[in-house]
């Protein structure tokens, strides 16, 4: 089954190359023209906040469709830390941190609205606190959903690493509050928790999965230190043909984004990116 294949800007833009967004967009434009990808997923980074006009204009000028935006990851960490502060009685500090998280979230939504992006991936929890106070994170979802909707956006909650519980259990807590949103399955995080098969055959969550992130993972069960460096398919332990079979079995017709990076101090490994996209294009 041929599914829409996108490439994350996060695979091409980072501190190591001075956040060279324009250079990355040139590569993505070439890949799109060659029909190697059908679009991009805009990975939000703090460096973009002061350059909103330049970033959005670069995306527009590229002509590459932008069906998905990835909310800045730190927002989930802030929500987790705010929950921990609330439960420890530090309500004033918690309120200030939560307000800052929502301020940044609204700014992310504004980026998406500028570009007409209809779906936003969100890390609902994160950082060291992670899902230790998951009820607080889940409790924030209705307001996040309402805020996103005001900008014409639907939220997709990701199966991010969970230090207290596990992503699948947390997703099941999310479901009653998901509204018109969806779920996004990350292969690397699924392997970290050894939940790839369990998640993709689960009758409650599988039908809500409408987007997939692809990268490989070389560590063991709950080996959080092995999450980086982010590997390309074939460099780690994930059985991607088996993953593709599970997606086929569940009748998955949604989109797939490659997240594995190809950037370095001396530029981009474009041939490697091309090989990975070709592999995924033939498999998925």
Predicted regions span which residues?
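N-terminal pre-domain/capping segments
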Residues: 1-107, 113, 149, 180-182, ...
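Active-site beta-loop-alpha junctions enriched in small/polar residues
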Residues: 8-12, 43-45, 71-74, 125-127, ...
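Distinct, well-ordered alpha-helical segments
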Residues: 18-21, 25, 51-56, 131-142, ...
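Acidic/histidine-rich catalytic cores of soluble enzymes
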Residues: 39-40, 145-237
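Active-site acidic/histidine proton-transfer and metal-coordination neighborhood
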Residues: 80-182, 192
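A short, acidic, amphipathic alpha-helical segment used as a generic capping/interface helix at domain edges
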Residues: 235-249
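Aromatic-rich peripheral "rim/lid" segments of glycoside hydrolase catalytic domains that contact
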Residues: 263-284
């Amino acid at each position: 089954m041929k599914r829409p294949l996108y490439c994350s800007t996060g695979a091409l833009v980072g501190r190591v190359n001075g956040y060279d967004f324009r250079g990355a967009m040139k590569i993505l434009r070439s890949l799109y023209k060659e029909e190697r990808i059908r679009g991009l997923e805009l990975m939000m980074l703090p460096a973009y906040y002061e350059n909103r006009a330049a970033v959005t204009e670069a995306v527009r000028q590229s002509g590459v469709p932008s069906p998905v935006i990835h909310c800045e990851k730190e927002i989930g960490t802030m929500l987790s830390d705010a929950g921990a502060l609330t439960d420890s009685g530090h309500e004033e500090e918690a309120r200030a941190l939560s307000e800052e998280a929502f301020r940044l979230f609204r700014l992310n939504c504004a980026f998406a609205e500028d570009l007409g992006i209809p779906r936003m991936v969100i890390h609902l929890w994160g950082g060291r606190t992670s899902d230790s106070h998951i009820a607080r994170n889940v409790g924030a979802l209705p307001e996040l959903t309402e805020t996103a909707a005001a900008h014409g956006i639907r939220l997709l909650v990701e199966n991010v690493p969970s230090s207290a519980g596990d992503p699948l259990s947390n997703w099941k807590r999310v479901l009653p509050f998901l509204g018109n949103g969806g779920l996004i399955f990350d292969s690397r995080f699924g392997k970290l928790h050894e939940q790839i098969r369990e998640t993709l055959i689960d009758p409650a969550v599988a039908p809500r999965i409408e987007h997939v992130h692809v990268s490989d993972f070389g560590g063991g069960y709950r080996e959080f230190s092995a999450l980086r460096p982010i590997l390309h398919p074939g460099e780690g332990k994930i059985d991607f043909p088996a993953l593709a079979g599970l997606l086929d079995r569940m009748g998955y017709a949604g989109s797939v984004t490659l997240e594995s990076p190809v950037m370095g101090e001396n530029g981009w490994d474009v041939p490697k990116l091309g090989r990975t996209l070709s592999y995924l294009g033939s498999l998925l």
